[in-house]
Amino acid sequence: LGAEAPHKGVRVLAVNPGLIETDRMVTLGEAQAMEKYGDKTRWREMLSNLPEGRAGSVEEVADVVTFLASPRASWVSGTVLTIDAGVTKRAGL
């Protein structure tokens, strides 16, 4: 579809965000840390395994989506953009 639609002014894109810090992510992270360590505050330590040592922000994903929706990204189509600070590359995926 990404190769068929651009001449009609339609771009086909997918954004695949990694671990993004939201209220729900914090709740789940605290629960996982409580289960693993018996201390919900240690969930941030678990993020140290990520390449950036932290989760991404909603704003970081929004910035990428804003760019993709702009005329500056008119040449981008038919792709999935993973936003995860290299987690999938580190994992060999």
Model-found features: residue ranges?
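Conserved alpha-helical elements of the SDR catalytic core
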Residues: 1-5, 64-65, 69-72
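Short, small/polar-rich loop/turn modules that mediate ligand/substrate recognition or access, typified
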Residues: 6, 11, 76-78
